[in-house]
Every structure is written in structure tokens, then in C-alpha cells.
Amino acid sequence: DSCGKTTHIFYTAPFYAFEDIAYLCPECIANGEAARIYDGSFQDDFSVDDGVDDPEKLDEPIHRTPGYSGWQQEYWRAHCGDYCAYLGRVGARELRALGVLVEVLDDPMWDEEQKDMIRESVNGGHLQCYLFQCLHCGKHLVWMDFD
């Protein structure tokens, strides 16, 4: 919709704008053109982790990074003073298979009850975990929400 170029790859997930946008090309997302043209965003600027002091870095997840679909409000994790890469939907089984379950539980965001929920989560279930990875140190983090 944004540039008019022919592409066989396009984005159809969340994009928040006044206009109803059918699809966006990856190039227009990456260079920020889609967000600029439609005055839209891929992520709510209040639904991101604290700890990123550089306001320029907020532009990346909001205007130049494809969002993901969650049950409730999507949330973008941060670590080492920067926003993380989103890796995908996971449950406890996938976290164990990747060898990162213990790592994601080592997160001050989660209390013991929430850690138990992560340990029992099922990918595609009523409690969904979303896996992120720090761009600087490689640490894995999750966000979770309910249907």
C-alpha cells in the first residue's frame, strides 16, 4: 500500500493508523516510510520496557519494526539499554528445547507466581509467551499475556 512497488513479501500484522491498511512492504517498514506516510505505528510507545535512555532508539520498534500479534496489548522488551529482537511465540516446551527456560526466569520482572506460569505455559494456549533476545549480550527475555 505505501510505495506502490511490486513485492511478493508483505506485512499484514498490527499497524496502528487512522486508515485501514491492507498490507505494507518490508522496505517501507524498515526505512520508516510506511509509518510516515500513514502517520502510524507498529507498537504503542507506552508498551515498552523502561531503561532505554536514547529517544532515537524508540523509533525502531514503533516506526520501523514489524509488530507481533498478542492476546492483549503487545509489549516490547529491552535489555542493555536497547530494545530487543522479537524471536517468536513460545511455551515452556520451546523454552526448554532452546535451553533458555532458566535464563528467562532470571528476570526481575517476574515474581514466583509468574515464573510458575511461564514454567507451565503452552505455546498457543491461554497463556502465551513471546520470546525476545538482547541485541548486545544475547540474553533471552519473555513477555506473556492471557486470552
Which residues does each PLM region occupy?
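Preference for intrinsically disordered or flexible, low-complexity segments
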Residues: 1-147
